[in-house]
Structure formats: C-alpha cells, structure tokens
A protein has these predicted regions:
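Residue-level recognition of tetratricopeptide repeat
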Residues: 10, 44, 89, 122-123
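Structural motif corresponding to the intra-repeat A-B loop/turn of tetratricopeptide repeats
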Residues: 24, 58-61, 103
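Conserved structural position within tetratricopeptide repeats
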Residues: 2-6, 35-39, 76, 83-84, ...
Length: 133
C-alpha cells in the first residue's frame, strides 16, 4: 500500500494515521507516523508509547530491543503521574524487564519488575520475573 504523506502540522492526524497503520500491521509506516507526532509534540508520552508498540511488533522476540528507548521515554514522561498512566507504565516496564531478562541483566530487570509491583502488587509477569535466576 502507498504511504500517505499528510501536509498538516496537526499531531492528531499523525496519531490517527499511525494507529491505522499499526492495526493494519504496517509497523514501519506506523513508526514513521508516530515519529512525526513526536516531532510535533515531544512532551506528550503518546507518540513514544505507540512508537514503542510499533517497534516491539517488528521485533517480537525482543532480540534487538528496538522498542526500548521509546518505552524508556514513556516511563520518564509518565512516572510523575503513575496512577494516571498505570497501564502505560506497566506495559513499558514489562518490556524493559523482559528485555533485560533475556539479555541476562537481572539487576536491571528486577528494577523494572519492582516498578510494576509498586503499581500492581499482584502482577504475575513481574512476580515471575523476580523469581527468574
């Protein structure tokens, strides 16, 4: 399919376009749209969050960790309002925890798992992550 090139500076257009590409499994195009959203609104977490998802979908085994910098930015932008962004913070830290687990850095993985447990003490992914050697 052809890439749509909006001439607008309206971030909402790039958000909606990125979502359309994402749900159509066109992850590279989604990433490009969310990149433009970040360019227009760098202080908003949502562009980084969806860019992280688009990159995670391109690296399903998390071998390359291409979503990591975007999930880290989500954590940075959302941590001050943890209750409001609980779902986003949990998803972001789950990715980070898993990334460090498969890359054999238990100390960094455990930091991510513990951040999740502060928001959701019964989170099974985090509890299981902490049990891993």
């Amino acid at each position: 399919s052809k890439q749509i090139r909006p001439t607008t500076k309206d971030p909402k257009v790039f958000y909606e376009l990125g979502q359309a590409y994402y749900y159509n499994k066109e992850y590279v195009k989604a990433d490009s749209s969310f990149s433009k959203l970040i360019e227009l609104k760098p202080s908003l977490y949502i562009g980084y969050f969806w860019r992280a998802r688009a990159n995670a979908a391109q690296d399903p085994e998390t071998k390359l960790g291409i979503a990591k910098p975007y999930y880290e930015k989500v954590i940075e932008l959302c941590s001050a309002n943890g209750e409001k962004y609980e779902d986003e913070l949990i998803e972001s830290n789950e990715y980070i925890g898993y990334y460090y687990t498969i890359h054999r850095d238990k100390a960094k993985a455990d930091v991510a798992w513990n951040k999740i447990l502060k928001l959701d003490p019964k989170n099974t992914k985090a509890l299981n992550g902490l049990k891993m050697k």
